[in-house]
Amino acid sequence: MKLQRILLTSALLSACVISSACSAGDSDNPDGKGGSGTGGASTSQGGAANASGGAAMGGASLGNGGSGTGGSVAAFGGASNSGSGGGANGGNGSGGATTGSGGAATAGSSGSGGRSAGGVSNAGGSAAKGGSTSVAGSSSSAGSGNGGSVGSGGSTGAASAEDEGADCQVGTLPDSGALTANSKLPDPFKKLDGTRIASKSEWRCRREEIKKLAEKFVYGEKPAKPTMVTGTVSNSSVTVNVSHNGKSSSFSASISLPSGTGPFPAVVVVGGFGADTTTIKNAGAAIISYDPLAVGKEGTPRNNKQGAFYTIYGSSSTTGLLAAWGWGVSRIIDVIAQSSGSVIKADAIGVTGCSRYGKSAFLIGVLDQRIALTMPIESGSAGVPIWRGIPGEGAQSLSSAYGEQPWFGDAFGAFTSSPTKLPIDTHEIVAMVAPRGLFIMDNPHIANLGPKSAHVAALGGAEVYKALGAGDNISYWSDVQDGTHCAVRPEWKDPLTKSIKKFLLKSGSDPGVIKASSKASGNLADWRDWQTPTLN
């Protein structure tokens, strides 16, 4: 194995030199600061070259997490850097339909894990505004150790709206100057008015509060659907045309269909590397290959952002790239939803990506409730890991992540050295996906990625899943052997297949699993001073 790895390293380094795909790296940065650029094809797992930017779709690779300087390895689709390398699924609770707006569901009511409005059962349908998610079985505690189911029951279906809480009356958000330090993770169940939610139906608007806080202090605003979104869907591509306030832009994504007869569920693969597309297609889902750099370009200053999003909302927009990239996927879903539905199912869409595109996949799934399955891979700082944990873990610093690319919104710059002042943390961002499917994949061998902090975020978010009766719908898996960044891993093949079958094909019911490596296991008890309530 060591000899094979040495030979692979030598070959990839040679390819790196020949193709001029290498860029200067940063020892604190798993993606590499030289990610964007011009010219230079990069090596991908499938062997395809990418001549747009020095890194493959802007992503840089890591070699086995080793530290030091000198040539690192171009691994599975990312361009190499000179510099150091630095869940299964949830169960379908039988009889999980809700009763009307704000009504509590009971196990045994009609429907099959679905959500409904006005008391009408709906297998896999969208949630009513104010409607609660059903509980089909009791939830169990998700521990910080390896393995184990994280709960049971709950809906698995995506919502029919991008933001189901858009009509919620959110109170006054705090000013940054009024924020005080809190070393513990904020209570996800505590509303802006200081009271805690007591029912599942209240989560809809509590979620909206968290969303508004995240947009104000962390990511920048993700605007709602523009005035006009049109486009086409074919067997090979989806095109998107957007018009808003007298401005217009367009972009497209390619489609690769699995065998069989459509329409098919689909997984949006952000950035083009790190995702196990073979397993995804073999499970029966199409691949939508999304180039986020067409929507928000890397390598631009914060006061002159470029791409389809910024053409509409202005180059000086304070919205960061992660939210802008999410806006692009939401517009793709708009077009699919408006199409004939003969190619792609609009209500069975997932999203995945690795490294910087793992950060993107995470937020894409968070901010669009029409996405049924969110699968971030090795997302690192600005992704899943709790911000409060990053300084103590030795992960890429928040100031480094903020300065590397305008991923965060501009406002986050005030918190890079004081994350304890933030009124939210990523366990609440994780919780925003609930009760939909979430499968977080991580790498315990690269401390730079913050895997301990990511594990804590998953455990904290899982508390909300359990409170909503959807504990089976979240998984976290970092128990893997290969430390290569963004590698396609055999340990994830089975849970990936089961996740797709459950959340996209609606044909599975496997319980969620928290399976953390002993190399990077976090402990939620060290980070919280609140307890999970029993919601009505």
Language model segments and positions:
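Sec-dependent bacterial lipoprotein signal peptides
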Residues: M1-S20
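Mobile cap/lid helix-loop segments that gate and shape the active-site cleft of serine hydrolases
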Residues: E378-I429, G450-A458, V464-G471
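Extended catalytic-interface subdomain
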Residues: A324, V351-C354, P376, G409-A411, ...
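Ser/Thr-rich, Pro/Gly/Ala-heavy low-complexity intrinsically disordered linkers and tails
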Residues: C16-D163
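Cap/lid segment of the alpha/beta-hydrolase catalytic domain
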Residues: V269-S340, A346, G380-G389
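Alpha/beta-hydrolase-fold serine-hydrolase catalytic core, especially in secreted/extracellular enzymes
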Residues: A161-S252, L257-G262, A434-N536
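Primarily recognizes the serine-hydrolase "nucleophile elbow" in alpha/beta-hydrolase
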Residues: R331-G394, G403, F408, S418-P419
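Loop/turn elements at helix/coil->beta-strand transitions in domains of secreted/extracellular proteins
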Residues: P263-V267, A283-I287, K345-A348, Q369-L373, ...
